[in-house]
Amino acid sequence: MSASGSDEVAGGGQAGSPQDFQRVLRSFGVEGGQYSYRPFVDRSFDVTGVPEAVERHFDQAEHDTAVEEQVTPAPQIAVAPPPPPVVPDPPAIVTETAPPPPVVVSAPVTYEPPAAAVPAEPPVQEAPVQAAPVPPAPVPPIAEQAPPAAPDPASVPYANVAAAPVPPDPAPVTPAPQARVTGPNTRMVEPFSRPQVRTVQEGATPSRVPSRSMNAFPRTSASSISERPVDRGVADEWSPVPKARLSPRERPRPGDLSFFFQGMRDTRDEKKFFPVASTRSVRSNVSRMTSMTKTDTNSSQASRPGSPVASPDGSPTMAEVFMTLGGRATELLSPRPSLREALLRRRENEEES
């Protein structure tokens, strides 16, 4: 394996990456993809040339500081010359003189040509009409331009030329100008009639008229394309990803209450296969302390020392306790049956019989 970065620095070579990953992997036991555990203490991390490394570190720091000190005065010298070239101020004054030209250009030159182009022909007829609408300020400008536009198609020959291509266009376009011509005095229709006259003048492109009608009625266009309401099921069939056959309205309903009681598990089946031992409380005429200190005289097994009496509540009997403890320390509590006791019991039994 190649030497680590720290080893190269100690040997006098150039320092590699700040951390040698190969050595780290080798020390932690991950080399070769085999996750073999090794202690996290790696002796190769011990620094050997402490004084040299420290001296070099400080020398490098001093060199860096010295270079910084040398570099900092240089910018100060370079900053000194820039103050003289303060000439950029005159250009700022020139920019201030720039506003006057925009003022000259801002004259309403662009708005004049359209206004002059439309009412250039009717000014002769405007003389009688101008007298009435002069008092109202906002409405007259629209009313002055529109009424002349209505009589133009009938009187001016240019309107007749424009009316010729109208028949090939769709039928709804032709009756609209006729209805507006019949009612020139109604000012409410004027703003709607003026743009249609302009569309007729634009004229030679019949494709624009149906496009505008389509945009005006998006509902009609959508119905003409589909010819039926969009079906969600049909739209799902187009998708390549298989989806559930149930529509959103036909969602399956939960068959039982488990849908609402998610946290509660049904343990009926579990109780069948995994019965739990239930503790039963048995009440006997002998208390626990009495059963540990005395023998039960009512039972026939009490006279037999070899067969221990099973306690009714499941607690360990004295014999079991003695067997567990070893029997030596319990001789004083329960003395072993001696030969004398055996003879006395035998005599009693003979007398009873």
UniProtKB/Swiss-Prot annotation:
Coiled-coil annotated spans: none
InterPro entries with a match to the protein in the record: CcpAX
Signal sequence interval, chain numbering: none
Comp. bias regions, Pro residues: 80-91, 165-175
Compositional bias of kind Low complexity: 117-132, 142-164
Region (Disordered): 1-21, 75-94, 117-337
Record field: compositional bias (Polar residues): 196-226, 278-304
Domain of life: Bacteria
Protein name: Cellulose-complementing protein
Organism: Novacetimonas hansenii (Komagataeibacter hansenii)
